[in-house]
Curated annotation (Swiss-Prot):
Its EC number is 7.1.1.-. Pfam families: Oxidored_q6. It is a peripheral membrane protein. It is an enzyme of class 7 (translocase). It catalyses: a quinone + NADH + 5 H(+)(in) = a quinol + NAD(+) + 4 H(+)(out). Its cofactor is [4Fe-4S] cluster. This is NADH-quinone oxidoreductase subunit B. GO terms for biological process: aerobic respiration; electron transport coupled proton transport. NDH-1 is composed of 14 different subunits. Subunits NuoB, C, D, E, F, and G constitute the peripheral sector of the complex. One of its GO terms (cellular component) is respiratory chain complex I.
Length: 189
């Protein structure tokens, strides 16, 4: 028995709920999959560099949707790319989260009015949990969005649904399934 064992043996009981343990584990090990489509992808890559050290937050980027629990959509989503975004989203295991990064991903950006080929926001095809504004947003803004995702995870639990947690964080959302169906119909027409 060493000196360390004596200190630990006095405090070896932790009282908490299963929700708190599960949420702590999930928010402390986010595995985002970056889906970089335009200028915002450069800022997303800069955020993953050593200057910002996302690993201190427990964030480890992954390249496969099957190993990710967070999808970062960064950049302009075109109508042709929309179906692939949905496919990647559906390949992610539950619970899964989506962060929309940049004006183009949030609302169509500068292509909103005249761009017939640009999706007017990724939330029309998949449910978005956190929006990061900017054109392109700075790495600090993306880190702020990631911290919002962690806050959302902390609020979720066995008794609280994601919908209730999202209502606490933000306003109402668009029903994504209806828009997915509309995009698929327009793509086949």
């Amino acid at each position: 028995m060493g000196l360390l064992d004596a200190r630990i043996s006095n405090r070896n009981v932790l009282v908490t709920s299963v929700d708190n343990v599960m949420n702590w584990a999930r928010l402390s090990s986010l595995w985002p999959m970056g889906f970089g489509l335009a200028c915002c992808a450069i800022e997303m890559m800069a955020t993953n560099a050593s200057n910002y050290d996302l690993e201190r937050f427990g964030i480890f980027p992954r390249s496969s949707p099957r190993q990710s629990d967070l999808m970062i959509v960064a950049g302009t989503v075109t109508m042709k790319m929309a179906e692939r975004v949905v496919t990647l989203y559906e390949q992610m295991p539950e619970p899964r989260y989506v962060l929309s990064m940049g004006s183009c991903s949030n609302s169509g950006g500068p292509y909103w009015h005249h761009g017939y080929h640009v999706l007017k926001g990724v939330d029309r095809i998949i449910p978005v949990d956190v929006y990061v504004p900017g054109c392109p947003p700075r790495p600090e803004a993306l880190i702020g969005g990631l911290m919002k995702i962690q806050e959302l995870i902390r609020m979720e639990g066995l008794g609280i649904s994601r919908q209730d947690a999202l209502k606490k964080l933000a306003g109402k959302r668009v029903d994504p399934q209806q828009v997915i169906d509309q995009v698929r119909k327009s793509a086949t027409a």
